[in-house]
């Protein structure tokens, strides 16, 4: 840069250079070296209400197998969307959706891709109930680690597993997804699964985030019917259904899934006692909770909300 003759010009140049540098300064939330809490607080402070609402939404991607329509699928995804249930194997489709979020949204928040990795991804293992029969949690941890690596290589960041519902009614149709009727067994294998999926560091390219489900009492539905009422006393809640979740949260589970069912009259997805008083206040869980499929609009059917706005 040429030496300027006049001091006034030199000062002006310095001011302009400083302003340009300030404009180019990276936001705290994009600084990988900054503490997580600072990055989160900075990002949230920049978000509009609409952007926050979009981050709470989850769409599906990849259910349309017609390749000619895949571009249309991506067009339907808001750039500010929070997460996708990813049903496909097309890396180009997945990457195009992510590119849209990163480049076409104001803040460039990446999409979280989730999938039901239950008992393996490409390599299939025995169902969870069968795994419990082995009483070999170390082997289950290894199996979940393999599933995590396969899923991550396919573009999945987050699995809706493990299911640790303490199921004691054989009529319930999802008994096979859990680890049986004993709270301790569910706790042990749930923790093993979490360790396998997440490892020591979820930023590892071979790991995925785990999700404890279904919080809570989903398996205790009347007559084993899905989506219906449960009558659970506080003692039964704590003696039978709480222990596996408490163990899973203490083991570092990144997320939980709220259940469809009422818990003695209050829907699981709108239950202040279980979601806030226990999970957040008592256990200090700092991850997030995802509702089960359409469980939030179902609050209308359960008589808990008048419309979708109130349900949300």
What do the PLM-derived regions correspond to, one by one?
Residues 1-25:
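Bacterial Sec-dependent N-terminal signal peptides
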Residues 18-312:
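Glycoside hydrolase catalytic-domain context in secreted enzymes
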């Amino acid at each position: 840069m040429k030496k300027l003759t006049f001091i006034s010009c030199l000062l002006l140049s310095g001011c302009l250079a400083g302003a340009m540098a300030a404009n180019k300064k990276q936001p705290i939330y994009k600084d990988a070296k900054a503490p997580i809490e600072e990055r989160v607080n900075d990002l949230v402070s920049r978000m509009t209400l609409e952007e926050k609402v979009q981050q709470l939404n989850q769409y599906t991607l990849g259910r349309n197998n017609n390749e000619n329509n895949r571009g249309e699928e991506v067009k339907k995804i808001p750039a500010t969307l929070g997460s996708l249930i990813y049903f496909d194997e097309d890396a180009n489709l997945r990457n195009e959706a992510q590119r849209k979020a990163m480049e076409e949204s104001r803040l460039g928040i990446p999409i979280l891709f989730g999938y039901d990795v239950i008992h393996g991804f490409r390599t299939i293992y025995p169902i969870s109930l069968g795994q419990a029969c082995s009483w070999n949690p170390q082997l289950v941890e290894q199996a979940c680690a393999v599933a995590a690596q396969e899923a991550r290589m396919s573009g999945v960041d987050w699995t809706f597993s493990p299911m640790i519902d303490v199921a004691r009614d054989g009529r319930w149709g999802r008994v096979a997804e859990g680890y049986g009727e004993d709270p301790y067994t569910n706790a042990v294998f749930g923790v093993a699964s979490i360790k396998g999926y997440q490892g020591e560091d979820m930023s590892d390219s071979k790991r995925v985030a785990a999700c404890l489900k279904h919080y809570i009492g989903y398996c205790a539905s009347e007559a084993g019917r899905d989506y219906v009422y449960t009558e659970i006393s506080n003692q039964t809640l704590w003696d039978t259904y709480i222990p596996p979740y408490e163990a899973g949260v203490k083991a570092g589970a990144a997320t939980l899934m709220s259940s469809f069912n009422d818990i003695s009259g209050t829907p699981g997805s709108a239950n202040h006692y279980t979601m806030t008083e226990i999970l957040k206040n008592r256990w200090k869980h700092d991850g997030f909770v995802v509702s089960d499929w359409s469980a939030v609009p179902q609050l209308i059917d359960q008589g808990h909300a008048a419309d979708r706005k109130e349900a949300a």
